[in-house]
Amino acid sequence: MSSNPSLFSRIIHGSLVLQIIVGIALAVILASVSASAASQVAFLGDFFVGALKAIAPILVFVLVASSIANQKKNSHTNMRPIISLYLIGTFAAALTAVLLSFSFPTTLVLVTGIEGSNPPQGIAEVLNTLLFKLVDNPVNALMTGNYIGILAWGIGLGIALHHGTDATKAVLNDISHGVSQMVRFVIRLAPLGIFGLVAGTVAATGFDALAGYAQLLMVLVGAMLIMALVVNPLIVYLKIKRNPYPLVLKCLRGSGVTAFFTRSSAANIPVNMALCEELKLHEDTYSVSIPLGATVNMGGAAITITVLTLAAAHTLGVQVDFVTALLLSVMASVAACGASGVAGGSLLLIPLACSLFGISNDIAMQVVAVGFIIGVVQDSAETALNSSTDVLFTAAACEAAEAKANS
């Protein structure tokens, strides 16, 4: 005699996307009815993001070490084409931002700069920071979420254990599966976590503060939408030679939605890993490409840096020719790849880009302050684009390699 599944069982095995949509709707309703009540449930969002950030470093370290240690001879990880796609995507994002900024010139109402901010003094400093993150203490890298360092030590341990005994490799593989199971549990908390994040955000801002920056937000979000729905699909089509939209939409739905609300590429790594597993991608590939993408695949950051820099130039009446704009695209692309190595991310790399037009640091920091005001939307959209693209390009490279092998 069959029995109806319990409510708990239905929740555990139900559609995660549908549950997230319900959570968003309930959060908006709660914040509209009672801002104080919405503020009190905001801790659920902090708890969820904290759980993701806590599990992500150990997940990356164990998965990378396990996949390399257990890698079969003559197997290919397709990392070179994935890294190429990351770089092409980031530059295309900066170029898209330039074209949209030229089409819709934006003037900023500058405000007081952010106190205590310490932007990098040049591109050399950004690259220097990234280089030294490679040789960070492994324990410190795990504690601070330094994914460049975690990748380096994970790869090193994996190579060292590749020649170890089968028993050692089996233990590492079992630990990897155990951590992955913990990640699945944390991801099931997404509807509750996003409910708290949305409720807290709407209660705190009401989005009234964003009204004065409507055009700037339209250019920023518009550029990111064009990248997500036009440029990225075109890049993927050239790679896999078939309709890219089923894959694009699956990545946006499975990765972008969660990333939009967590506003953290690092926190979204476990979500992306689970999506890659669902897509049946090569574990040896995605265990490296996803954390690497969370560090260097920064199309959204390139858009933010480019749009706000050109908005500052337009506000000050600085004439920008096409060659200079092209140079800005290159600089924004390189700077964006180092965004994860700078406290404050893409916003604090804006002074670096502004220096290209001779804009003073004082003015540049006022532009950064504008970025913090619109950060609720800007950072969410930027993270959603960055994170979903990690899975998209990984899947495209894996599919192209598989098609080539079968031909």
From Swiss-Prot:
The keyword rRNA-binding does not apply. Pfam families: SDF. It comes from Shewanella denitrificans (strain OS217 / ATCC BAA-1090 / DSM 15013). One of its GO terms (biological process) is serine transport. The keyword Magnesium does not apply. This is Serine/threonine transporter SstT. One of its GO terms (molecular function) is neutral L-amino acid:sodium symporter activity. It is found in: Cell inner membrane. It catalyses: L-serine(in) + Na(+)(in) = L-serine(out) + Na(+)(out); L-threonine(in) + Na(+)(in) = L-threonine(out) + Na(+)(out). Involved in the import of serine and threonine into the cell, with the concomitant import of sodium (symport system). HAMAP family: Ser_Thr_transp_SstT (MF_01582). One of its GO terms (cellular component) is plasma membrane. InterPro entries: Na-dicarboxylate_symporter, Na:dicarbo_symporter_sf, Ser_Thr_transp_SstT. Keywords: Amino-acid transport, Cell inner membrane, Cell membrane, Membrane, Symport, Transmembrane, Transmembrane helix, Transport. Gene3D superfamilies: Sodium:dicarboxylate symporter. Belongs to the dicarboxylate/amino acid:cation symporter (DAACS) (TC 2.A.23) family. The chain crosses the membrane at residues 11-31, 43-63, 82-102, 141-161, 192-212, 216-236, 298-318, 339-359, 363-383. It is a multi-pass membrane protein.
